[in-house]
Amino acid sequence: DLRDFKKLGRPRLFFGISPGCMDSMVNKYTANKRLRSDDAYTPDARPDMRPDYPSIVYTQILKKLYPDVPVVLGGIEASMRRVTHYDYWQDKLMKSILVESGADLLIYGMGEKPVVELIRRFNDKRLSLNTIPQIAYLCKTTDFISEEGDIRLFSHAECLKDKKKQAANFRHIEEESNKYTASRITQEVDGMTVVVNPPYPPLTEAELDHSYDLPYTRLPHPKYKGKRIPAYD
């Protein structure tokens, strides 16, 4: 039943998908790969409210219902899967979540700045989305133009053949994620290139205050009225 995906109608700019403040698979399964008995973030702690890999599932559904509407991923699940990554649950290397899901863009890390800039550029059709810091996107490898200073990771196919190449990739990702001035990261997969733009600098104190002083209700969704959500308690 896909009616819930249509209740809000077609968005003016894009669909934004983030499964929550904790990796959905860690939240759903134990380290022994058994289904958890409860979920701290769902009404009445039900453990069956979300599918496996919800970013992928939700994106694929939205692309079927609204194929011409962009989908932007964000949150922990997408951030940790922006390039080739080891999936504990399937015990294998998986491609970028952009490939697996079919999403158009991915915002990684804390998204206060990139999401505001993304909306500004969606509203101004003259501006490119692909130069926004702290986003990742896919393009055809034949159309990709490298830049000086780019870090080219081993391709997904190379990582499948040699685990040391995946380890080398992971080192680059970790180093660039923690630099004040980072490099752009690229990786080839299935004739496409994943491009990960360097992040914004850390927010200033004033920027943090502005973000957290917005008029959030800090309440559960009204749909869950009368139901207990453990994390909110």
What are these regions, as identified by a protein language model?
Residues 225-233:
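N-terminal pre-triad scaffold of radical SAM enzymes
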Residues 2-190, 196-200:
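Glycine-rich beta-alpha loop elements in corrinoid/cobalamin-binding modules
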Residues 184-193, 212, 220-223:
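Short acidic (Asp/Glu) and glycine-rich catalytic loops that position anionic groups and cofactors
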Residues 1, 6-7, 208, 214-217, ...:
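Amphipathic repeat-derived elements
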